[in-house]
Curated annotation (Swiss-Prot):
Gene encoding the protein: C
Keywords: Disulfide bond, Host nucleus, Host-virus interaction, Repeat, Secreted, Signal, Viral immunoevasion
Main location, first listed in the record: secreted
Organism: Woodchuck hepatitis B virus (isolate 2)
First and last residues of every Sequence repeat: 189-195, 196-203, 204-211
Region (Disordered): 180-217
Residues excised as propeptide: 189-217
Identification of the protein by name: External core antigen
InterPro entries named among the record's database cross-references: Hepatitis_B_virus_capsid_N, Hepatitis_core, Viral_capsid_core_dom_sf_HBV
Feature: compositional bias, Basic residues: 188-210
Amino acid sequence: MYLFHLCLVFACVPCPTFQASKLCLGWLWGMDIDPYKEFGSSYQLLNFLPLDFFPDLNALVDTATALYEEELTGREHCSPHHTAIRQALVCWDELTKLIAWMSSNITSEQVRTIIVNHVNDTWGLKVRQSLWFHLSCLTFGQHTVQEFLVSFVVWIRTPAPYRPPNAPILSTLPEHTVIRRGGARASRSPRRRTPSPRRRRSQSPRRRRSQSPSANC
């Protein structure tokens, strides 16, 4: 249903249903829906990342297929991240079908170029962001991705003279967290190995009992 309204809006068909389509899609676009809220993130945090930060859609799709093909094509529910990846892939598949339909039905080359560029710059970018976010959460962990986004936002909003020259890297964050956990565990181990003073006191009465028969003789 929404694809029909999208076709009317993009093709700019001069018919009475055009205004109705704009109203229908306006209700949908006007809702404050942020699909990253349930994962502890937001659209605003992801928008701080530059456009060239996100890989190409073909690379993201190949990565998702190579790593999680069984989980994505299976019937069982694995995690909310797998479900989000499924929805992103289905959405992009429908958009590509829409572009192919408009390319074959719109005669103006200029209009087709404008539509394709608009789809790639808007919805294509959202699909890239969604696939990158959920694939990163499955690879590095959701908490690690949250820490990376917050640290990147702090880094990029800090003036250049007062920040490190290089931006935070997502792949280095899990190593630091492992080192911190190991250090905390290592500091507790010496306390457990120290002998308690009660054991030394318990040995003294035994020595006195062993000496008592020799004293009687």
